[in-house]
Amino acid sequence: MKNSAAREAFKGANHPAGMVSEEELKALVGGNDVNPETTPATTSSWTCITAGVTVSASLCPTTKCTSRC
């Protein structure tokens, strides 16, 4: 605003632009849901986990940490 009088008058105005209430923030992040935004482990997840453990066990022959692992 180039008009300094209008700019000064606007400074005193109570305008809520840009303000977000706590309820709105919770709604944005899923904080007011009964169940949070998570992904459960599915049947295909267990296949990947089992394969990862098997490959890891085959590469590291002992349970102790060594320079090979």
From Swiss-Prot:
There is a cross-link at residues 44-48, 56-60 (Lanthionine (Ser-Cys)). GO terms for molecular function: signaling receptor binding. The modification (Z)-2,3-didehydrobutyrine is found at residues 39, 42-43, 50, 54, 63. The modification 2,3-didehydroalanine (Ser) is found at residue 45. Maturation of lantibiotics involves the enzymatic conversion of Thr, and Ser into dehydrated AA and the formation of thioether bonds with cysteine. This is followed by membrane translocation and cleavage of the modified precursor. Disulfide bonds: none annotated. Pfam families: Mersacidin. Residues 1-37 form a propeptide. The keyword Calcium does not apply. One of its GO terms (cellular component) is Gram-positive-bacterium-type cell wall. The modification 2-oxobutanoic acid is found at residue 38. NCBIfam families: lant_II_LchA2 (NF038161), lant_SP_1948 (TIGR03893). Lanthionine-containing peptide antibiotic (lantibiotic) active on Gram-positive bacteria. The bactericidal activity of lantibiotics is based on depolarization of energized bacterial cytoplasmic membranes, initiated by the formation of aqueous transmembrane pores. When present individually, LchA2 exhibits activity towards L.lactis HP. This is Lantibiotic lichenicidin A2. It comes from Bacillus licheniformis (strain ATCC 14580 / DSM 13 / JCM 2505 / CCUG 7422 / NBRC 12200 / NCIMB 9375 / NCTC 10341 / NRRL NRS-1264 / Gibson 46). The lineage of its organism: Bacteria, Bacillati, Bacillota, Bacilli, Bacillales. The gene is lanA2.
